[in-house]
Regions:
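Generic low-complexity, intrinsically disordered sequence content enriched
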Residues: 8, 19, 27-28, 52, ...
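DNA major-groove recognition helix of helix-turn-helix/homeodomain DNA-binding modules
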Residues: 42-63
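Short basic helix-loop element that most often maps to the first helix and adjoining turn
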Residues: 5-19, 48
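Short, conserved catalytic or interaction motifs in soluble domains
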Residues: 36
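Key DNA-contacting residues within the recognition helix of helix-turn-helix
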Residues: 7, 32-33, 42, 50
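Short alpha-helical DNA-recognition segment
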Residues: 14-33
Length: 63
């Protein structure tokens, strides 16, 4: 099982960091820090964010 990263999930959803920031109400800088490894979100936050990005990706693919 390959673990999906927040960045992978964001790209799969077709979102920029700025758009993800708007949709999920997470500061853009925080998203950037997570993606570069400068900061690591708590595991539960990472799971919730990835789950939401997967939902957005499914919505976008069904249009």
């Amino acid at each position: 099982l390959i673990k999906l990263t927040i960045k992978d999930a964001r790209l799969n959803a077709g979102l920029t960091q700025a758009r993800m920031s708007e949709l999920l109400e997470i500061p853009k800088r925080t998203i950037g820090d997570w993606e570069t490894g400068t900061r690591k979100p708590p595991a539960y936050v990472e799971k919730l964010v990835i789950r939401e990005l997967e939902r957005i990706a499914e919505e976008n693919n069904s249009k």
